[in-house]
């Protein structure tokens, strides 16, 4: 069991904003903890994008998108620079897989990579891979369900580039 020493000594997580980049515009939110398991919307802003800046989830014009992010950030009034961004659903491959529950963390990572190579139509060095253990399998206590997610590295790198160009830390 991990101990959250920051919470133990009264330190909170650093403020973070969420960014949604779509073909029509940028949406920015900042949520803050307002109680146990409760969040409050602290800031929100949206900014339109010129036609063609983002097409089918692909960032086509980094300058236009980063400028819109910077305008939304300024308009929101937030001071947070740490940003979390999602990927467009069409750019992400997800697959629920079953793995043995006795695997170590390192063994789990290796097994996920092995399994991913069966489901991802790209070389693994071309993708960003992530996974999350969902829980144990109902009728098989020796197994666990794992959600696997993968997207092309270039898609992630484009989103990181626009956030950094806007002065944020993705």
Language model regions located:
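Hydrophobic/aromatic-enriched cytosolic interaction surfaces used to assemble or bind macromolecules
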Residues: 1-170
């Amino acid at each position: 069991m991990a101990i959250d020493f920051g919470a133990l000594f009264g330190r909170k997580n650093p403020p973070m904003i969420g960014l949604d980049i779509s073909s029509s515009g940028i949406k920015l939110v900042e949520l803050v903890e307002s109680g146990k398991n409760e969040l409050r919307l602290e800031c929100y802003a949206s900014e339109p994008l010129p036609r063609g800046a983002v097409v089918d989830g692909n960032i086509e014009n980094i300058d236009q998108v980063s400028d819109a992010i910077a305008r939304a950030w300024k308009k929101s009034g937030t001071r947070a620079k740490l940003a979390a961004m999602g990927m467009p659903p069409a750019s992400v491959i997800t697959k629920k897989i079953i793995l043995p529950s006795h695997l170590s963390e390192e063994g789990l990572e290796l097994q996920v990579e092995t399994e991913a190579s069966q489901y991802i139509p790209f070389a693994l060095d071309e993708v960003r891979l992530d996974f999350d253990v969902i829980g144990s399998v109902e009728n098989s206590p020796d197994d666990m369900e794992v959600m696997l997610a993968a997207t092309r590295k270039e898609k992630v790198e484009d989103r990181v580039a626009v956030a950094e160009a806007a002065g944020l830390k993705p």
